[in-house]
Amino acid sequence: YEFFGVVTNLVGGWLGARLGLNRTMNLGLGLQIVALAMLLLPTAWLTVPWVMAAQALSGIAKDLNKMSAKSAIKGLVPAGDEGHTSLYRWVALLTGSKNALKGVGFFLGGLLLTLIGFQGAILAMALMLAGVLGLSLLRLDADLGRAKAKPKFREILSKSRAINILSAARMFLFGARDVWFVVALPVFLATQFGWDHWRVGGFLALWVIGYGAVQAVAPRITGRTAGRSAAIAWAAALAALPALIALGLQVQGLEWLPHVVLLGGLLLFGAVFAVNSSLHSFLIVRMARSDGVSLDVGFYYMANAMGRLVGTLLSGWLYMTGGLSATLWVSSAMLVVTVAISLALPRQA
């Protein structure tokens, strides 16, 4: 899933600049409908490889839509946006609402599954998306995001030093989250805290909803100082948290302490990470070229997906070899690298 995210963002950014963001947006919606339709086959046909293929296609669709939407904002915000405050606000709102709805989707999926069954739920989602696709085909500007000069395929790699630095920082930032959040944390909650599948899933879904809510209001938290200094300061604040959680989990003698340390630390980490994420999302849209914006945004989110891929792989391996504490220490180390990389950002960023 994450591997296809790497490829999709890189190629999708080029397609968006060449063909227009309306086409990549509609392609993403269409692919998502196809992925859902693949799951409407009789249950006996739903083998693991088939479901994995549907999941991969769904991942491609999701990244096409995310890249298209975030790139489009740069062209939709009115000219003369003093201090880029409107741009920051809209990027944060889009980023936060997307993640909050992801968490809501966990509960909505469970409700649909209970009320109308698996195939009914899949069909309902496909029909809703078909309606959204119809609106998109009718209403989206045909030239949205299309570059005046069609970029060649070799231009998919960024030539901007600032964007390369920001992309590298983003890769380590998201690797630091997923190295302990994706595999290690759910397994720890199930095996050490004795939580069942629904409790683990429900808690993490609520965490994602809260995470998205904080992302949406990030401009109010950071104020107008949304630049290089803010990116460094917020990443530095985040770097300390996994290490503090790891130290807290080593304290012996109090049965309730690990629960308070881990769950409280997770909530605080989520809030600070959400601000970092919104801040970075704003910076890439602000720094991206105006003509062919999706080339830069696609390259940046390719680095994001690469960080998530590496973090996911490390999460399972580190948990097996060193437990949750090992993943937390590596997370802190990756965040220190994020801070070091961010120091190289241009001072006017």
Label every PLM stretch briefly.
Residues G120-L138, A326-A344:
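Symmetry-related core transmembrane helices of the 12-TM Major Facilitator Superfamily/SLC fold
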